[in-house]
C-alpha cells in the first residue's frame, strides 16, 4: 500500500479542519483530491507529506509512519506544493540536477523531456513564466521516480497545451507504479486521467468514487 491515512484529525485552536479522515491508495492509482475552498485539501496534503502532524490519527507512506519517521517516508515521496520555491538563479537543468544529487537517484534528461522543458533547460529559472516554473517544480518532484507523488494545485498557471503535457507525464509515472495524488479545482482534468476521486467537504470525505461520478460532484461545486 502506497498511502494509508488512518482516522486523521487536525485542529487549529477551536477549528476542526480535518475530521476522521481515512483512506488508502495503492501503487498505480491516480487520485483526484477535490473540494470547495476550506474543505481541508491543503491541510490533508500537508499531513500526507509530513509538514503537519495530525492532532490524532496517522499517515503511512509505503508503510512508514510519517509522524515518527518522516525522513524515511519522504525518501519515497515526490511533492509539488501550491506555491513551489525554486532557486531562480539556476537553470532548470541545474535545479533538477541538484534534486538528483540530494535524492541520490534520478534521470535529469528524462524529467526534462517528460515535462517539455528540454528546449529551455539551460535558461535561468528567473527568466521563466509562472507556467514554466511550475513545470520545473513538477520535474523536480518526479525526477527520482518516487513511489508516491503528491501535487497541490499543480496545474494552476499552465496553459492548455502544458496541462495536457503534464497530465501525460503524470499518467506515465502512474503507469510505472507510482501512486499519484493531485489536488485540483479543474474537474474536467480528472475525467481524463484519475482512477478515483476523493471529495472533501468540511474536513471529511463526502465522496470516494470513480471519475464517472464527476457530473454529480460538479453540481456540488455550484
Q: How should each PLM-predicted stretch be described?
A:
Residues 49:
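Helix-to-loop junction immediately C-terminal to a conserved catalytic motif
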Residues 57-68, 72-73:
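Conserved ABC transporter NBD signature motif
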Residues 97, 104-120:
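Conserved ABC ATPase "signature" region
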Residues 138:
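Hydrophobic anchor residue at the start of the ABC signature
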Residues 149-153:
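Catalytic Walker B motif of ABC-type/P-loop ATPase nucleotide-binding domains
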Amino acid at each position: 500500500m502506497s498511502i494509508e491515512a488512518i482516522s486523521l484529525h487536525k485542529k487549529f485552536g477551536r477549528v476542526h479542519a480535518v475530521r476522521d479522515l481515512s483512506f488508502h491508495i495503492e501503487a498505480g492509482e491516480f487520485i483526484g483530491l477535490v473540494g470547495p475552498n476550506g474543505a481541508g485539501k491543503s491541510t490533508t496534503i500537508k499531513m500526507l507529506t509530513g509538514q503537519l502532524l495530525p492532532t490524532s490519527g496517522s499517515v503511512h507512506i509505503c508503510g512508514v509512519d510519517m509522524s515518527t519517521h518522516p525522513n524515511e517516508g519522504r525518501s519515497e515521496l515526490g511533492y509539488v506544493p501550491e506555491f513551489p520555491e525554486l532557486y531562480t538563479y539556476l537553470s532548470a537543468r541545474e535545479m533538477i540536477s541538484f534534486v538528483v544529487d540530494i535524492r541520490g537517484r534520478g534521470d535529469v534528461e528524462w524529467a526534462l523531456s517528460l515535462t517539455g522543458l528540454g528546449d529551455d533547460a539551460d535558461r535561468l529559472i528567473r527568466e521563466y513564466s509562472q507556467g514554466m516554473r511550475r513545470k520545473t517544480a513538477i520535474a523536480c518532484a518526479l525526477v527520482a521516480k518516487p513511489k508516491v507523488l503528491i501535487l497541490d494545485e499543480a496545474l494552476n498557471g499552465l496553459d492548455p497545451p502544458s496541462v495536457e503535457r503534464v497530465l501525460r507525464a503524470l499518467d506515465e509515472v502512474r503507469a510505472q507504479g507510482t501512486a499519484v495524488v493531485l489536488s485540483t479545482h479543474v474537474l474536467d482534468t480528472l475525467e481524463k486521467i484519475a482512477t478515483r476521486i476523493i471529495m472533501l467537504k468540511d474536513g471529511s470525505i463526502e465522496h470516494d468514487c470513480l471519475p464517472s461520478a464527476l457530473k454529480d460532484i460538479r453540481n456540488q461545486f455550484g
